[in-house]
Amino acid sequence: MSLMQFSGLLVVWLLSTLFIATLTWFEFRRVRFNFNVFFSLLFLLTFFFGFPLTSVLVFRFDVGVAPPEILLQALLSAACFYGVYYVTYKTRLRKRVVDVPRKPLFTMNRVETHLTWVILMGIALVSVAIFFMHNGFLLFRLHSYSQIFSSEVSGVALKRFFYFFIPAMLVVYFLRQDSKAWLFFLVSTVAFGLLTYMIVGGTRANIIIAFAIFLFIGIIRGWISLWMLAAAGVLGIVGMFWLALKRYGLNVSGDEAFYTFLYLTRDTFSPWENLALLLQNYHNIDFQGLAPIVRDFYVFIPTWLWPGRPSIVLNSANYFTWEVLNNHSGLAISPTLIGSLVVMGGALFIPLGAIVVGLIIKWFDWLYELGNREPNRYKAAILHSFCFGAIFNMIVLVREGLDSFVSRVVFFLVVFGASLLVAKLLFWLFDSAGLIHKRTTSLPQAQVEGKL
């Protein structure tokens, strides 16, 4: 890459970053937090944060990258996607009407709410315990990270249930919403994340998500300022780098340490070069249509229920890794949100996907506002827990693609909804057995004596 080509890419990168960052800043000033702000920051991080890191790798370490024209296409496709997304998100689909009282879809009481978070926590802890009994601490047993996807590891499907510990702790926080509950959420979820990191053998997702939710709650409540958020972001990058070194068993120093930091940070937070790599191989893609979305559900179907289930799930990430790149190392390479759309339908699917994503984020914000207006604090805690719990699915949406997001959000909705139903059923059984008693508030001693 020549300096002239780099200068052109730099101008496009600066304009695109300024465009998205400005819109995000105005939205932040208006509402402080909503899921549009979160998605915008995540999109900016995924598709634009990596450009400076790539530039240093190219000019400092002479690392090979995609041709400049392909990198330009990646930057422009990301900027255009966001433009279509933002217009869709801001477009009002119907006239604003004065809120009319309507019968709620469901309601919650104190016992049902506590039963819900206990059930969610139980799902996570039981899954971790079973996985541990089968595999032990994989971090100290396996020699490479790719081995966690091999036949040596049993009960891999259980990992999908680990995450429900975070929504459980979110319910606990939203019932109190004070600084002590906020700090308890951080300590409990990060401790659980470190435990799963050691048991699974290097999966950092639970730690990243817990820390991100903690920061956003702090921003909403005014407990964290922007400079504190920036400092926490730097700390998070360093922490994820250290965990990555441990995961891959790397021992580096000097220039090698700097090089490793750059490429691991880029791959962890901003895999934008994967999109460029996909566009570079555009002519090798046999567009898959909506099949990757359907195929991604296969992993949730046990083999005893479907004996003929394909052992290889050809979602967009696996198609990109195996069919386009001919890479069979055992690890799937994330195509990113835009890349998954390209795999499904080429360039035409990029604006269509942006419209779909705009509607998805609009729905989550509607649900979040519903929780903010809800007078029943128990129901509000459940709604907020569901919304913030879905942050992991939004990270999957931007990093992995639309197909992975759809299957995971449906799975999350089913498990969360089933936990609610079980909690309500248990409450009904306990109430029928006469085990539920209304809380009575005792009068102060002085008032009691006065009444006597």
Swiss-Prot record:
Q: Where in the cell is it found?
A: Cell inner membrane
What is its pathway? Bacterial outer membrane biogenesis; enterobacterial common antigen biosynthesis
Transmembrane residues, as ranges? 6-26, 37-57, 63-83, 118-138, 155-175, 181-201, 207-227, 228-248, 341-361, 378-398, 410-430
- One GO cellular component from the entry? plasma membrane
Please tell me where this protein is predominantly located: membrane
Q: Which InterPro entries match?
A: WzyE
The answer to whether keyword Cell membrane applies is yes
Membrane topology type: Multi-pass membrane protein
One GO BP annotation of this record:
enterobacterial common antigen biosynthetic process
Q: Which UniProt keywords apply?
A: Cell inner membrane, Cell membrane, Membrane, Transmembrane, Transmembrane helix
Q: What does this protein do?
A: Probably involved in the polymerization of enterobacterial common antigen (ECA) trisaccharide repeat units.
Subunit description: Probably part of a complex composed of WzxE, WzyE and WzzE.
Q: Which NCBIfam families match?
A: PRK02975.1
The family line of this record is: Belongs to the WzyE family.
Name of the featured protein: Probable ECA polymerase
